[in-house]
Curated annotation (Swiss-Prot):
EC number of the protein: 1.2.1.8
KW Secreted (keyword) present: no
Alphabetized GO MF terms: betaine-aldehyde dehydrogenase (NAD+) activity; metal ion binding
Pathway: Amine and polyamine biosynthesis; betaine biosynthesis via choline pathway; betaine from betaine aldehyde: step 1/1
Keyword set includes NADP: yes
Family: Belongs to the aldehyde dehydrogenase family.
Catalytic residues, chain numbering: K162 (charge relay system), E252 (proton acceptor), C286 (nucleophile), E464 (charge relay system)
Annotated binding of NAD(+), by residue: G150, A151, W152, K176, P177, S178, E179, G230, T231, A232, T233, G254, C286, E387
Assembly: Dimer of dimers.
Name this polypeptide is given: Betaine aldehyde dehydrogenase
């Protein structure tokens, strides 16, 4: 029997069953246990959600920005009050260690909601004089009903990153969580309703892409789509959204990010950064620095430091607060990661550690893959070129800065990049040449609410977070006012 009762759709401020009657199993990846049967939304459910969202958005947009901000801040307070319970649910559904979900997932999502609740009041137009008797002004108006599609690695955080600017700007949102990890998005919908959000302003439609995802991107009454996921799926979403009704899109997509360790770097600091950039959340982070470039002369010393740190990883039950490394999110994803590892071996990369599924003792039913490090990698290897989205670090050597930058940029991706060096002049010189939307110097992975997040090239379109994202959920209206008698040429 599933641990939780059937999970319904959330439309119009309440739970409703899917009209088609179909459900999807949601599994605990640490044990293989079925957590719940979740109703699988279809096109009829989407139409109902759009009708609800249109009605709710009219009420929501009619409120002042101060009134909207107060409601969003009440939701922030509820999120923080329920952090532990939400984190535990997130851990059950994603397999991420409780030590992570308690300190990062809900916390950072709430931070973003708090940020937009504050800056929403600064969303102002401009008044510009043209001549003595004429001027124009601009208004930032909400788009209306927007759609969002989340990924399975940071379910509640992604839901909040997408909902916060959209709602702060006066829109309604229909959110489709990943069918793998939909549970906390439903709890978020409850919290928004409890905080006072008008019914219909935040609807949640669990379901797979075939049943509801494609319909969401094509729906003519949805004005914008925000998507987080893989690049291949992102292309399909973008094509569908544009071909149906020229929707605006925001895309936070995949990456194969470089981390350049400079010759003057503290190798202990660099190894700590490389570990976090590859094995946090079991490697299921889009910004992971999976291509680690190290000077050829430092390779062996750096390998030794990495291997020593791998020994300190605590692999186990994600609900155990001592655990720092959990399973992958699903059996299917685990299999894809293992296939990439086998390809790395076949193409000649030298396996330093890991490279296998973990099935000892209590791990036997879970989707655990050992922290894996390959050395002697080359740029043409599949594990170096393709996003794996798992705990697989590829170590590459270089001889000079120009070579490192050229090879770091030789990818279709451009999400993130990092440099480790005590020389800030060198750091800026390298960072300014790296083709990536998010760059870190002597650190990795932090994405505070005011910091825009997004990629270059095929890693995305538009940005999440930051002030510009709030404006991206509005449309600008220009209004000219003539104070003098209008002079016609006829």
């Amino acid at each position: 029997m599933p641990r939780f009762p059937d999970q319904l759709l959330y439309i119009g401020g309440r739970y409703v069953p899917a009209r088609g009657g179909h459900t999807l199993e949601v599994v605990n990846p640490a044990t293989g246990e079925v957590l719940a049967n979740v109703h699988n939304a279809g096109v009829d459910d989407l139409d109902a959600a759009v009708d609800s969202a249109k009605a709710g958005q009219q009420r929501w947009a009619a409120l002042t920005t101060v009134e909207r901000s107060r409601i969003l801040l009440r939701a922030v307070a509820l999120l923080r009050e329920r952090n532990d319970a939400l984190a535990q649910l997130e851990t059950l559904n994603t397999g991420k260690p409780l030590s992570e979900t308690r300190s990062v997932d809900v916390v950072t999502g709430a931070d973003v909601l708090e940020y937009y609740a504050g800056v929403a009041q600064a969303l102002q137009g401009a008044q510009v004089p043209l001549r003595e008797g004429s001027f124009f002004y601009t208004r930032h108006e909400p788009l209306g009903v927007v759609g969002a599609i989340g990924a399975w690695n940071y379910p509640i955080q992604i839901a909040l990153w997408k909902a916060a600017p959209a709602l702060a700007a006066g829109n309604a949102m229909i959110f489709k969580p990943s069918e793998v990890t939909p549970l906390t998005a439903l709890k978020l919908a409850e919290i928004f309703t409890e905080a006072g959000l008008p019914d219909g302003v935040f609807n949640v439609l669990p379901g797979d892409g075939a049943s509801v995802g494609t319909a969401l991107t094509e729906h003519p009454q949805i004005e914008k789509i925000s998507f987080t996921g893989g690049t291949a799926t992102g292309r399909k979403v973008m094509a569908s959204a544009s071909s149906s009704s020229l929707k605006e899109v925001t895309m936070e997509l995949g990456g194969k990010s470089p981390l350049i360790v400079c010759a003057d770097a503290d190798l202990d600091v660099a190894a700590d950064i490389a570990m976090m950039a590859n094995f946090y959340s079991s490697g299921q982070v889009c910004t992971n620095g999976t291509r680690v470039f190290v000077p050829r002369a430092l390779r062996h010393a750096f390998e030794a430091r990495l291997l020593a740190r791998v020994q300190r990883i605590h692999i186990g039950d994600p609900l155990d607060e001592r655990t720092t490394f959990g399973p992958l999110a699903s059996a299917a994803h685990m299999q894809r990661v293992l296939e990439h590892i086998e390809q790395g071996k076949a193409e000649g990369a030298r396996l330093l550690c890991g490279g296998e599924r973990l099935q000892d003792g209590a791990l036997v039913q879970g989707y655990y893959v050992a922290p894996t490090i390959f050395s002697d990698c080359t740029d043409v290897m599949t594990i170096v070129r393709e996003e794996i989205f798992g705990p697989v670090l590829s170590l590459l050597t270089y001889d000079d800065e120009d070579e490192a930058v050229t090879r770091a940029n030789a990818t279709t991706y451009g999400l993130a990049a990092g440099v480790v060096t005590p020389d800030l002049a060198r750091a800026h010189r390298l960072i300014h040449r790296l083709e990536a939307g998010i760059c870190w110097v002597n650190t990795w992975g932090e994405s505070p609410a005011p910091m825009p997040v997004g990629g270059y090239k095929q890693s995305g379109v538009g940005r999440e977070n930051g002030l510009a994202t709030l404006q991206a959920y509005t449309r600008t209206k220009s209004v000219q006012i003539e104070l003098e008698r209008y002079a016609s040429v006829f």
